[in-house]
From Swiss-Prot:
Encoding gene, per UniProt annotation: tat
Keywords annotated in UniProt: Activator, AIDS, Host nucleus, Host-virus interaction, Phosphoprotein, RNA-binding, Transcription, Transcription regulation
Stretch list, region Core: 67-77
Annotated positions of the Phosphoserine modification: S92
GO molecular function per UniProt: RNA binding; RNA-binding transcription regulator activity
PTM: The phosphorylation by CDK9 does not seem to be important for transactivation function.
Name of protein: Protein Tat
Species per Swiss-Prot/TrEMBL record: Human immunodeficiency virus type 2 subtype B (isolate UC1) (HIV-2)
Any single GO CC term annotated in Swiss-Prot or TrEMBL for this entry: host cell nucleolus
Residue numbers spanned by region Cysteine-rich: 50-66
Length: 128
């Protein structure tokens, strides 16, 4: 099962020469460099408006803006409205008054409790 010398020499020559399969990765690395530069340029480019209203997985990841809005749920468009100190003071005093009014109505007074207890003790009803 020995290979003749001519075939061995030809196989050595073909292995030392760059084949089409070895030249493809070189092209791919150059292409990937271009892709990397393109991705970086897209990263630093300002986000463009996207009017896509769909929330499916494909639409959530199709552009960076949709990913931020739909995928992560981050909205930078709305600014927070800060209320003044006066509004906080009046809101807290109004909430205190409403809480005291609600708690007074919801709990029975001591007089009502004693009436229920005495009535339960006097009325024995038919028992054993």
């Amino acid at each position: 099962m020995e290979i003749p010398l001519q075939e061995q020499e030809s196989s050595l020559k073909s292995s030392s020469e760059p084949s089409s399969s070895t030249s493809e990765p070189v092209v791919n690395t150059q292409g990937s460099d271009n892709q990397g530069e393109e991705i970086l340029s897209q990263l630093y480019r300002p986000l463009e408006a996207c009017d896509n209203k769909c929330y499916c997985k494909k639409c959530c990841y199709h552009c960076q803006l949709c990913f931020l809005k739909k995928g992560l749920g981050i909205w930078y468009d709305h600014s927070r409205k800060r209320s003044s100190k006066r509004a906080k003071v009046t809101a807290s005093s109004a909430s205190d008054e409403s809480l005291s009014a609600n708690t007074g109505d919801s709990q029975p007074t001591k007089k009502q409790k004693t009436k229920v207890e005495t009535k339960g003790l006097t009325d024995l009803g038919p028992g054993r």
